[in-house]
């Protein structure tokens, strides 16, 4: 028969409270079925366990009890036998309550608690084994087997759990623990046979080592023997300390020093070095050099003094020479050593510029200082430096360094500052090694300037920054290499021939030039500050996402375009067409307010002269000019234009190239007049990152003069003269294939001319492009048939609807007519219209990834006019549609296909000037 209990009653005793807490956790205890039997069961059990029963306790009336088991004979049976029999009534407990030894507890009054019976099986979700009478049960054997199984379980867990070795920080030894859980339950582990004695608790500083992990390496102990290493002195500190050597007490530097120098020490493990002891001694000037450097010196079997002697023999611009030249110089002076290792050492210690203070010279003349720093035991004892070192200090003064670490000094030695380069006055070529250096390499001297780094690239050449050897003023040199390519050489000569004649305050000046007949052309010019108009438009973004108001965008476009118009009018007055007008070729210099911004036209590689009677001249000159002597007429044209266009009054003497001039422009942005223009060494720096306009690649060279520089340079006014006065610039007309500078800016007549030259017509040498109409081909044929009727005394010319000009000499009706170039002022005006549109809208008017399609769009003049109208008519309702209307009409007039209807420069200037005046008036009214 089985009996069980559910819950002990709460009677306030500690034991009953413990029982109640156990019940709340879901654990039950075995007991009988009724309160009456509970009292009887507790009384008999106390007697069975040898507990004395009070005499005054009344006996229970079993007649009124419902129990079916009578325990008194069992007590008598136990008393009669020495050991319990197999029929013993036992109390089996679960492991959840290992401390339960009885089914009832004694209350403080000495009685037993009334216990409630458990519910029948099925009504309770959790039961334990209650008091049970099991016949033939050997309880002792059962308990022993249970204990043995528990021990086996713990042994299995200990073998499967990684053993953790814990270091006792107090005792310095290691102890084994079975698991992290065992660490927290230290008392329980003491009962296990596999644990070791440990009475100390863990601390956060204790280190843990898992022996069963893949890494069985013990922690690396910290070294006990270490040497003190000091940081090297800076140049300023070394120079300050070296000044104390002239005092009366040369053996005690710190006695005369009022400053306390803090020692920076670091403890590092002692490492063996293959360097001889002489290098590690305090007397050596290299006693705190990097170990790798000392090892290199040891491997090369060269002493520091020998290294200094070698450096003295090298040219002062050794690091600026090409690699092949440096190699030859090293082999010449040190043939028995590895030139690569020697070059590495020289790079580390040769420079004494502001970018590097870690040099042999600095260590040689501060040997006593380094000794004082390295010696910690005798800091007040110093050695007197020798006289030779003192002399070297006076000849090679140290400079303050901005870089403190050895690593940064070593890296900076590979890229010396341009200040030190500009101060080098010696010949860059020395000895037999000089023949291998190219004349355009970094560090070379050209036109009185020292070449610096490359800051731009072009179609055939590069742009290098340069510095005046005498003054240090920064400029740029355009280097175009031809090396036997006669076509490129002719192209460069043509550019210089035109550029040297252009002297205008809105044209980038050619300060000096030099021709190397077998190598390259060098063109010296100023350096402009703030990028190009292309950079400015990129900063504005497209009109839909414009970062500035439309009103300001239109005013700035007009203001900058009027300056460009001044340069174009001057060039056209000299019968010169630019041929490559675009945003990238308009340099921008920002000075203070926006009203002080200046535009400079550059890149004359596509420029050429055009005939005065050119049909594409677009009425650049006065119509009443006679067709007499060409030379006299050209001279009178310049005089006429100077009177007609007072804004182009800057024409200095050819003997000087004074880039500074006063200007009295009619158009202003906010102020009515400009201040005298004095460029301040034009240094370029574009602060914003660029994103390129989506346009096809062009065949022209990009702008090369707007790269950044370090600082503004002083004004340069000394005249320059070309180095080749006898250079023949005749017969340098551009090749027909080079008429198109940038395809998105090309005019329709240039494209048709290019298509006609690519064709192979037997009669006219004119075949139109695949996208041209048959009417254009017929018009070209009819135009050529009319050539025979022209006068024999003049050179006949005709213009077809397709924009192709044909001419034929007199009396040569049987000869094939040649095609006259359409490149003229009208082409520059078309490109100007493309520029205006791009500045206003923020994108090119003609743009397509497929080049044939782009050509077709340009020929038919198809572009987005609605976007242009949105920008130009930004406040049409408020101002009755007058503001921006002239700017819109100007762009449309410039982008007109019909040459007769395409606007002229004079009309463009008048309309834009009126727009500017009206905009300023409205701006002043709004401000007031």
UniProtKB/Swiss-Prot annotation:
Ranges of Polar residues composition bias in the record: 1-12, 30-40, 86-107, 683-696
Residues involved in ATP binding: 455-463, 478
Top-level taxon of the source organism: Eukaryota
Entry's Gene Ontology molecular function annotations: ATP binding; calcium-dependent protein serine/threonine kinase activity; calcium/calmodulin-dependent protein kinase activity; calmodulin binding; protein kinase activity; protein serine kinase activity
Phosphoserine: residues bearing it: 178-179, 405, 426, 737
Domain spans labelled Protein kinase: 449-912
Purpose: Serine/threonine-protein kinase involved in the phosphorylation of the NAD(+)-dependent glutamate dehydrogenase GDH2. When overexpressed, confers hypersensitivity to rapamycin and induces rapid nuclear accumulation of GLN3 to activate the transcription of nitrogen-regulated genes.
Subunit structure: Interacts with URE2 and GDH2. Also interacts with the TORC1 kinase complex.
Protein name in the entry: Nitrogen network kinase 1
Species in which this protein is naturally found: Saccharomyces cerevisiae (strain ATCC 204508 / S288c)
Gene: NNK1
């Amino acid at each position: 028969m089985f009996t069980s209990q559910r819950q002990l009653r709460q009677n306030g005793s500690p034991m009953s409270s413990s029982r109640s807490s156990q019940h709340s956790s879901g654990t039950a205890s075995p007991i009988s079925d009724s309160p009456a039997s509970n009292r009887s069961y507790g009384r008999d059990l106390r007697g069975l366990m040898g507990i004395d029963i009070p005499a005054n306790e009344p006996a229970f009336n079993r007649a009124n009890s419902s129990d079916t088991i009578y325990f008194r004979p069992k007590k008598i049976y136990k008393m009669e036998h020495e050991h319990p029999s197999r029929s013993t009534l036992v109390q089996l407990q679960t492991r959840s309550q290992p401390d339960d030894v009885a089914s009832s507890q004694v209350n403080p009054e000495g009685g037993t608690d009334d216990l409630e019976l458990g519910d029948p099986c099925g009504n309770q979700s959790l039961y334990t084994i209650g008091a049970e009478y099991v016949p033939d049960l050997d309880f002792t054997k059962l308990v022993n087997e249970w204990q043995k199984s528990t021990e086996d379980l713990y042994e299995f867990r200990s073998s499967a759990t990684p053993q953790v070795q814990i270091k006792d920080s107090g005792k310095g030894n290691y102890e084994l623990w079975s698991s992290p859980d065992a660490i927290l339950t230290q008392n329980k582990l003491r009962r296990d046979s596999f644990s070791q004695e440990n009475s100390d608790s863990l601390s956060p500083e204790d280190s843990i080592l898992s022996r069963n992990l893949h890494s069985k390496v013990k922690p690396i102990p910290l070294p006990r023997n270490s040497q003190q290493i000091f940081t090297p002195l800076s140049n300023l500190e070394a120079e300050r300390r070296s000044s104390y050597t002239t005092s009366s007490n040369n053996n005690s530097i710190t006695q005369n020093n009022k400053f306390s120098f803090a020692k920076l020490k670091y403890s590092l493990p002692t490492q063996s070095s293959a360097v001889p002891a002489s290098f590690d001694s305090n007397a050596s000037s290299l006693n705190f050099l990097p170990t790798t450097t000392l090892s290199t010196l040891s491997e090369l079997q060269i002493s520091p003094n020998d290294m200094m002697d070698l450096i003295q023999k090298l040219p002062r611009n050794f690091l600026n020479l090409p690699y092949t030249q440096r190699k030859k110089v090293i082999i010449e002076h040190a043939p028995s050593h590895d030139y690569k290792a020697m070059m590495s050492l020289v790079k580390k210690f040769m420079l004494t510029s502001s970018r590097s203070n870690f040099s042999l010279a600095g260590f040689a003349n501060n040997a006593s200082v380094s000794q004082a720093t390295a010696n910690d035991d005798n800091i007040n004892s110093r050695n007197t430096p020798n006289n030779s070192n003192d002399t070297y200090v006076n000849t090679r003064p140290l400079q303050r360094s901005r870089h403190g670490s050895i690593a940064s000094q070593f890296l900076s030695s590979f890229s010396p500052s341009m200040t030190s380069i500009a101060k080098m006055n010696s010949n860059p070529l020395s000895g037999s090694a000089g023949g291998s250096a190219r004349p355009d390499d970094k560090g070379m001297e050209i036109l009185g300037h020292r070449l610096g780094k490359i800051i731009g690239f072009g179609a055939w050449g590069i742009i290098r920054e340069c510095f005046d050897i005498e003054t240090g003023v920064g400029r740029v040199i355009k280097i175009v290499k031809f090396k036997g390519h006669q076509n490129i050489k002719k192209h460069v000569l043509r550019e210089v021939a035109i550029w040297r004649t252009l002297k205008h305050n809105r044209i980038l000046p050619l300060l000096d030039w030099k021709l190397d007949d077998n190598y390259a052309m060098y063109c010296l010019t100023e350096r402009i500050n703030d990028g190009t108009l292309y950079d400015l438009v990129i900063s504005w973004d497209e009109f839909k996402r414009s970062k500035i108001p439309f009103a300001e965008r239109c005013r700035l476009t007009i203001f900058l375009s009027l300056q460009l118009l001044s340069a174009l009018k001057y060039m056209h007055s000299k019968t010169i067409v630019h041929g490559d007008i675009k945003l990238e070729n308009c340099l921008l210099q920002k000075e203070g307010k926006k009203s002080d911004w200046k535009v400079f036209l550059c890149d004359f590689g596509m420029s050429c002269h055009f005939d005065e009677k050119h049909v594409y001249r677009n009425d650049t000159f006065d119509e009443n000019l006679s067709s007499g002597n060409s030379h006299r007429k050209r001279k009178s044209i310049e005089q006429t234009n100077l009177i007609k266009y007072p804004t182009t009054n800057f024409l200095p003497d050819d003997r000087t190239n004074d880039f500074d001039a006063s200007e009295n422009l009619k158009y202003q942005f906010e102020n009515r007049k400009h201040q005298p223009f004095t460029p301040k060494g034009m240094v370029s720096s574009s602060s914003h990152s660029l994103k390129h306009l989506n346009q096809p690649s062009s065949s022209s060279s990009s702008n090369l003069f707007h790269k950044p520089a370090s600082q503004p340079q002083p004004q340069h006014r000394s005249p320059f003269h070309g180095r080749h006065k006898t250079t023949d610039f005749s017969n340098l007309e551009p090749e027909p294939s080079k008429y198109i500078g940038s395809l998105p800016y090309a005019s329709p007549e240039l494209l048709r001319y290019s298509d006609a030259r690519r064709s192979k017509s037997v009669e006219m040498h004119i075949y139109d492009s695949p996208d041209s109409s048959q009417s254009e081909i017929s018009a070209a044929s009819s135009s050529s048939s009319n050539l025979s009727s022209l006068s024999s005394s003049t050179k006949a010319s005709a213009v077809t609807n397709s924009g192709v000009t044909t001419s034929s000499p007199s009396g040569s009706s049987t000869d094939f007519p040649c095609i006259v170039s359409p490149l003229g002022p009208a082409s520059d005006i078309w490109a100007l219209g493309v520029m205006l549109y791009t500045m206003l809208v923020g994108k090119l008017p003609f743009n397509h990834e497929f080049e044939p399609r782009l050509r077709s769009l340009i020929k038919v003049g198809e572009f987005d006019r609605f976007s242009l109208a949105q920008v130009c008519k930004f406040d049409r309702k408020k101002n009755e549609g007058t503001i921006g209307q002239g700017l819109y009409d100007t762009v449309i007039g410039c982008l007109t296909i019909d040459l007769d209807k395409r606007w002229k420069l004079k009309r463009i200037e008048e309309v834009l000037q009126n727009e500017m005046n009206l905009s300023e008036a409205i701006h002043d009214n709004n401000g007031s």
